[in-house]
Amino acid sequence: MTYIIFAFAALFEIAGCFAFWAWLKLENPVWWLAPGMVSLALFAWILTLVPSEAAGRTFAAYGGIYILASLLWLWLVESRVPDRYDIGGALICLAGASLILFAPRG
């Protein structure tokens, strides 16, 4: 369930940030900020649904999923194929996020 929450959080965070990017860098109209802000608020709320006692650990584990989702966005939305360094870096980050998420704690 955590991965599903992380996936939705990433979608809303990336979409929200892209709205700001589109306004500032692509010169889209200022009204792009309204759905961007709603999307970022949904991102923040959804991340609170992760069953965890520590916000920082949740955010750190989520970081790996965010990187993977960002590269998917790069490929599917921006039509730019991730290169070997993108993929290698993402794999390293996912390994770290998995360690944070699944480490035995007691």
Swiss-Prot record:
Coiled-coil blocks: none
Intracellular or extracellular location(s): Cell inner membrane
Keywords recorded for this protein, A-Z: Cell inner membrane, Cell membrane, Membrane, Transmembrane, Transmembrane helix
One matching Pfam family: UPF0060
One GO cellular component, as annotated: plasma membrane
UniProt family annotation: Belongs to the UPF0060 family.
Protein name: UPF0060 membrane protein RL1530
Organism: Rhizobium johnstonii (strain DSM 114642 / LMG 32736 / 3841) (Rhizobium leguminosarum bv. viciae)
